Amino acid sequence: MMWTISIILAAMCFGGIVDVTGVMGTVAQGLLKVAKGRGGLVLATELMCLITNAVCCDQYLALVLPGRMFKEKFEDMKLRPENLSRALEDCGTITSNFFPWNTCGATMRNFLNVDSSYIPYAILNWLNPIVSVFFGYTGITMTKLTDEEYAAILEEREAEKQAALKSLEA
């Protein structure tokens, strides 16, 4: 049990370092350059979740980091926050057990005494991200922000920007 807890602590520390240094942001910017349209954005979000699961070794980081990185892009495409949340869940959560060094994979292997040979048979875990990307490209279940909601988001961003500038001056 201590081994699993130590992996979680190390993953959180590593995730913080990767976030603060901007490494994951650089990867996200590269993905965003090729993400054209709604479907490309969903695909980029899911790829970022997979990369984060593999690199940062923690499912929670695979939800939080890509969520923060892609939030504004989803808003700028006038997609409701539920769309981002679903993309994160459809790939970030459900694929974390594919990586034996990830906290979910390590916990599963320790508690259930199961090795990685089950992965080809985890059909839901493979199929769910594919269906999510399909929904992104076709627009099925992808809800949009109204113009009023988007205007409110832009006002909130500006207020946050002004507050940050004010705190720098102090």
Identify the residue ranges that each predicted region occupies.
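Alpha-helical transmembrane segments of multi-pass membrane proteins
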Residues: 40-53, 77-98, 119-128
